[in-house]
């Protein structure tokens, strides 16, 4: 266990420095590249914070969907491997038409949607927030 600042805090501080101190002082392609660097640091920070719990949730959901016993995995690497294998199995079932109809289709859509949302929580949470806001507005319009 490391003392503070944590790796996440260091990445967030570095990203803030790039945005506040460097980006305003440069122009053109270099400014764009600096913004990309800050964004990458924030993505890595979110991944460090969120990847383990999100991977555990994904493995559990895929195991339930595919009717496997939920594996008791401890390392993040093992979770990644299990998620990839079950993801490939689900992909094969979808390609075979197993999710074209019936109640399982709804379950598949729910699991896939959650997986995409979890990936967006790391890669681009603002997109996810905007999507949720748009869906909420559409739902409200339908209720009127």
Across the structure, where does each feature detected by a protein language model lie?
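N-terminal interaction modules that seed assembly of large macromolecular complexes
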Residues: 15-52
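Short, charged early-sequence alpha-helical segments and their helix-coil boundaries
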Residues: 47-64
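C-terminal amphipathic alpha-helical interaction region
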Residues: 8-9, 14, 30, 59-144
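Short alpha-helical segments enriched in small residues
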Residues: 3, 7
């Amino acid at each position: 266990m490391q003392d503070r600042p944590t790796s996440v805090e260091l990445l967030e501080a570095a990203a803030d420095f790039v945005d506040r101190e460097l980006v305003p002082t440069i122009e053109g392609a270099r400014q764009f590249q600096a913004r990309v660097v800050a964004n990458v640091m924030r993505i890595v920070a979110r991944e460090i914070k969120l990847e383990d719990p999100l991977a555990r949730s994904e493995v559990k959901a895929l195991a339930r969907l595919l009717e496997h016993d939920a594996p008791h995995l401890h390392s993040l690497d093992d979770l990644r491997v299990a998620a990839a294998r079950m993801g490939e199995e689900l992909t094969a079932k979808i390609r075979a038409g197993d999710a074209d109809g019936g109640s399982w289709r709804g379950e598949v859509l729910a699991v896939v949607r959650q997986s995409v949302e979890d990936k967006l929580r790391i890669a681009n949470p603002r997109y996810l927030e905007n999507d949720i806001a748009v869906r909420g507005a559409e739902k409200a319009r339908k209720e009127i």
